[in-house]
Amino acid sequence: MTVKRERIDRRFSQAPPILQEAANSEVIFRDGWGDIVKRYDVGKLGLPADIAMLLADAFRHHHAASSHDTQRHCWMAMRAFARFAAEDGLVRSTGDLTSAMVGRYIAWLDCQVGAQTNKPWSRGSRANVLMQLRQMIDWTKRRHPSRLPERIDFPSRVWPDRQADPRLRLGAEDLKAILSVCYEDIDEAWDRFETGRAILATSGLVEGVDLELCDLVRALAVVDGGVLPSQTLAIRSGVRLSAVNRHGGLRYLGGYLHLTGETVAAFFIALAIQTAGNPDALRMMTRDCQMAHPLDEHRILVEWAKPRAGAKVKRPQKRSFDRRRPYAAPNLIDRLLAMTAPLATRASRQDRNRLFLVKSEKKSAVTLIAGSTLAHALKPFIRRSNARIALWNKAAPERSRPFLPDFAAVLLRGSVATEYYKASGGDILATQDVLNHTRTDTTIARQSG
């Protein structure tokens, strides 16, 4: 007796989309757990509606897996394009997105002047802004060519040799002066944090600490679970603002609870000089970045990721340090781990394992510190340090200290490599090891530039 079996349907069923996004000008980016990280509304840029929708779709899909910084750079580039469209007056619909419009846009970029520097935008900045628009248009060409009624092409190498001008190099004395100031700031921040831990560990008076300060630190810690509250929340919870002002203000008092935006710069600069790492790669350093040296019990390996290092196989960046030195990178990282521990529990799942965590003053959220925040923190750091050095030199002119130069984080890696190259007597292999380069020609190119 035969049994009639039903035919098995082996066709693949189409999986429903995990996240349904409405087709509008608002672009929503989410992290790996589906939580909303950032919203951008292209419709608020003042562009024509059809162009705003075109750019929003390209932005939403092309940069879905990009880093937050890349997404922000694209957003800034779209803002620049919106300013051009408003000033040009000839971009009224997608039909006006033509090769001629690209030429006018390039000429407009050549005329832009930085608000802070009062100098024309660098060739690299102009090229990056143009590249972001080109990526949006190229994505639309591939996916929705019908939305571009006119031909639009972008010329190649608009600004040749955009990195021809070599970056400035800081000398050995400059680097030593910067490190000295960083260590002073780190010691001050660590002493304040240790005092805060001693205050919170007891309900009574702490030796050498004002009683009002003890009560104030405990009151602030209770308001928001050990994280510095906003001024509004602190007042609402009964914290006396007059007492806060007498003891340096909320920002200063935050240092008794955890790492703050003012003190993170010193830690970051010191680690950037010691590791000779790329600033953005160091910013993404994780909390489990240390491991024991396989042969030397006194040395610790510090490891961090560099997304651009390696083609198909990503190779981590590593440096080893002697922990017996008081300001060696592992000891600084241990302090960072302790000072950011109260923040780590409040961070999102995506940022929870990051080392450089800070509390955002605008959003009252704990996040990985943004690259722009670090860049903006350098100016006040240099200004405060030079003011302190000026007081020192006035009080002890016979032991005067050099002032800090005006520098940016991107200058540190090349400056450290140059000093290693000089100290090794021109050994390019020693410099290659410091920079964690796989190929020697990469090191030669970086040193010559």
What is the role of each PLM region?
Residues 1-251, 270:
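Charge-rich, intrinsically disordered N-terminal extensions
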Residues 36-46, 156-192, 230-449:
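Extended accessory and catalytic-adjacent subdomains in large enzymes
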